[in-house]
Amino acid sequence: ATLSSHNFISETVWLAHKESLLAYYIAEADIFLATKGDEIIGFIALINLEVPALFVAPKYQNLGIGSRLLLYVKFICIHLWLRVYKKNKNAIHFYQNHGFLIIDSCIDPLTGEEQFVMDWKNRPLMN
């Protein structure tokens, strides 16, 4: 899912850092899985209030699985933030539909690509 949703980044970049990223997520993140039988079809990672990763297997995308994973962490957290590549228009739209706002931008040192910093707070419906 990483390669298909980030096709603007060279596959060699992901492959070069795959092991270190996996080790980091396993050591630092709470990881919540979406499964179908024994198959993992998606996951969301949570490190404190950051969502560093949300992926759904390509054949299971657009079925609400990513939304359910995100809604779960929104249920257990009052505030979340994440970074998303500026070129990943589908992800930006997805997060905006879930109440995230773009609050800043930065350059990812791993890829050299611009990212938006997005923020979500459990805001009351009425003031």
Predicted feature residues:
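Conserved acetyl-CoA-binding loop-helix of GNAT-fold acetyltransferases
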Residues: 62-75, 93-97
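Terminal substrate-recognition subdomain of acyl/acetyltransferases
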Residues: 116-127
